[in-house]
Swiss-Prot record:
Zn(2+) binds at residues 18, 21, 40, 43. The lineage of its organism: Bacteria, Pseudomonadati, Pseudomonadota, Gammaproteobacteria, Chromatiales. Gene3D superfamilies: 1.10.8.60, ClpX chaperone, C4-type zinc finger domain (6.20.220.10), P-loop containing nucleotide triphosphate hydrolases (3.40.50.300). Keywords: ATP-binding, Chaperone, Metal-binding, Nucleotide-binding, Zinc. Residues 6-59 form the ClpX-type ZB domain. This is ATP-dependent Clp protease ATP-binding subunit ClpX.
Amino acid sequence: MTDRTQNKGDDSGKLLYCSFCGKSQHEVRKLIAGPSVFICDECVELCNDIIREELQEGAATEGGGLPRPHEINRELDQYVIGQEHAKKVLSVAVYNHYKRLESRTSQDDVELTKSNILLIGPTGSGKTLLAETLARLLNVPFTIADATTLTEAGYVGEDVENIIQKLLQKCDYDVEKAQHGIVYIDEIDKVSRKADNPSITRDVSGEGVQQALLKLIEGTTASVPPQGGRKHPQQEFVQVDTSNMLFICGGAFAGLDKVIQERSERGGIGFSAEIKGEGERASVGETLQTVEPSDLVRYGLIPEFVGRLPVIATLNELDQEALVQILREPKNALVKQYQKLFEMEGVELDLRDDALRAVADKAMERKTGARGLRTIIEQVLLETMYELPSMENVSKVVVDESVIAGDSDPYIVYAGPEHSKAASDE
């Protein structure tokens, strides 16, 4: 059998080049010869990577098909603690959305309409994380847009087409892939009307944005500048159909509970009305569970916009137990992350149970939810993480409730005969 490879040192008298990248035999480790062509080892490796990626994508889409609601919920459980009702609503809505896309390929008299989602919940309750986890599970492009930066077309600020442009950038301008993506629009409550009545002045960042988002969310063909360029009349635009995209809007909707209470109290006037004392009022989370489209309209969303978001999921404020679980249990739990960082220094990090409860209490006081947990731990461990790489014979760092409260520094345990001491003693 003839050897069809060319090594760098072969003296054939003729300099050979890769037919694909143009590199000479002296610039690569090996050239493989074919009928009148050569390919180098680097191009072979690149081709293997491309094939491997395509096979993985194919396996993700074909392997088992679309995940069932139970499977979606189970995946969400690995990253999002609590919020069982919201996870169930999302699992069903996402399953039905992608089932609708499958049904569009078949000839059927029944046309399934799109069901976009509205997430209502306080800061740090897991709205963004739920959307991110869904996109990762379904292996579809995902982007986050901030509604507060959006304005009507023609005004200073981002127009709504920028959202689609970001999604296209995430999938290297693969239009077909982008058309099946998920878009999460955060802070949607900040574009509400300032009053229940339509304003006579131009509201370019409030009601104007809602009007601009209407068609995009319902399904339209958006014109996006190619490769992130600015719009000008002479250029050709990339046409993107948004009718198969899933839009998830999220917001804290501070004060919405009062709107709901007013509506429920108005409905209970007369002799048969149930009178409740101050202590008998439902919690904010329980009140939000009873939200109706009319409440959102009174809050400041225009009726047409509310109609485009038929699926509503409410998230509760996280209590101490849920925050401690978030610190410990998910795949990307903060405790596991910091323990890994310390492990890379050859040191064990021991975050005691009372310390985790104290961190949770601090986050609740600050009303930052799960988002504030990292900040608290970072502040507590900053000095230790600064000194640790320069210290020797450290085997363990212990953090208890007093450390979180600021009464003492983390305790450092040495591997040798030395006694344990606080980080500040160094």
